[in-house]
């Protein structure tokens, strides 16, 4: 029997039409996958702060656009060269690839692959889109390697990870960016040492990933810093030992508060997860003189940040990261296994659920103090 070629699919997607505009539900057409691509039926997706920045033109203002880069789905169809993937596979679309053969991949020191780097063009590798507005035929840009706020998406197979179908789909969605970024920053990027001290600025999903990673690494003191008192309880669930709410100490800087509970020394590692530019210098000051390491993780959308060079000359290390240094094919399955064996438990991340058609409401939910992670159901 001849194999039936996949056809165009008409479905619903969340579209941003202009810079700073609302996210609206549109009927779109999704083309079949080309040679090394797969078409994915999304099972669920989630919302990251970077998606909010996407609606504001980050990293490049390309519109109309479908946001979303966290999610999990099932492969509906594959191109003829979609290596190792088949219809029915449960997958995570990712914004990084890993060829395993380029200079960077061979060093084992970075997750930034020369062959499959983070894509920012909003288009597939051939310079075209697989998505169009159904009523007008207008081409739609996707976000990073593919967009997830849509019932169907197309991705290059090199930016897709086949996962164990036993994992909770919401948990898999949370692992496709935020939590993994924080966890990986302690594991892959800095190798947090046993008995060390850690400070985490911002206890959102990324910050909670840092806290759990630091706990599993054996850090003796894990200090969470957040102006939202609700986050204190969340932080403790993931392994935080101390909590600082700067609002309770209006006459002191964050670095002063951190030093007060570290015998005036500061911490071995400080992770800045808010993206607030002024806090980067505070993170540096909160780290130990001569040996402290600071990792900025939060996506603030700022093109540049002023750094006090005198702090750097004091022997501190500033180490930046993408996806926490986690290699998508080599490392991410290890984190998934930790979730499957309950070494990492992610139930506490999920605070709200919405249907795709209510996507605009999510932007108001994000402002609520008890919001950590919003799951989008299809």
UniProtKB/Swiss-Prot annotation:
Short name of one Pfam family: ADH_N
An annotated GO cellular component: cytosol
Protein's name according to its UniProt entry: Alcohol dehydrogenase 1
Residue sites binding Zn(2+) 2 per the record: 99, 102, 105, 113
Family per record: Belongs to the zinc-containing alcohol dehydrogenase family. Class-IV subfamily.
Gene: ADH1
Cofactor entry: Zn(2+)
Subunit structure: Homodimer.
The protein's annotated pathway: Isoprenoid biosynthesis
Molecular function (Gene Ontology), one example: zinc ion binding
The keyword Nucleotide-binding is assigned to this record: no
EC number per UniProt: 1.1.1.-
Natural source organism: Tanacetum cinerariifolium
Keywords: Isoprene biosynthesis, Metal-binding, NAD, Oxidoreductase, Zinc
